[in-house]
A protein has these predicted regions:
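Helix N-cap motif at beta-to-alpha junctions
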Residues: 14-15, 72-75
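Short amphipathic alpha-helices within nucleic acid-binding modules
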Residues: 21, 75-80
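Conserved short beta-strand elements that form part of the metal-binding/catalytic scaffold
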Residues: 28-62, 72, 107, 111-116
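Short beta-strand micro-motifs in enzyme catalytic cores
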Residues: 39-41, 65, 98-102
Length: 120
């Protein structure tokens, strides 16, 4: 399997301003969804890869977009990234009913999310 980008996510320091900006710029359909103790905003784009927005979980860091690549086994891919000189920023975490993700950095410091969809 190739590993396509399957999701993009904005971690914003001002989620209200970001929502107004992107909805006005692209006419995206935004939907706020309660997710544990936070609200996650899904981005509907029609065709193409959708995504989401959330409050930046790391205070003091700039707002940034992050892409997620599909993998067959997120635990194995995370371990492989580490063995190749990458670092694990967020270990494998379950998204109930949907799948699992981790966040890695490559040896240059660039972040990438890894996503494994739950099999039916």
């Amino acid at each position: 399997m190739g590993n396509p980008f399957v999701h993009v996510e904005l971690m914003s320091n001002d989620i209200g301003q970001a929502k107004t900006f992107y909805q006005s710029l692209f006419d995206w359909k935004l939907n706020d969804v309660p997710f544990g103790e936070m609200t996650y905003t899904t981005i509907g784009v029609g065709e193409g890869t959708g995504g989401g927005m959330m409050k930046n979980p790391v205070p003091g860091t700039p707002s940034a977009w992050m892409a997620y690549a599909a993998v067959d086994d997120v635990k194995a891919a995370t371990a492989k990234a580490k063995s190749l000189g990458g670092a694990v920023m967020k270990d494998v975490t379950e998204v109930p009913g949907m799948g699992w993700f981790s966040v890695i950095t490559d040896p240059t410091g660039a972040m990438l999310g890894l996503w494994e969809t739950k099999k039916a």
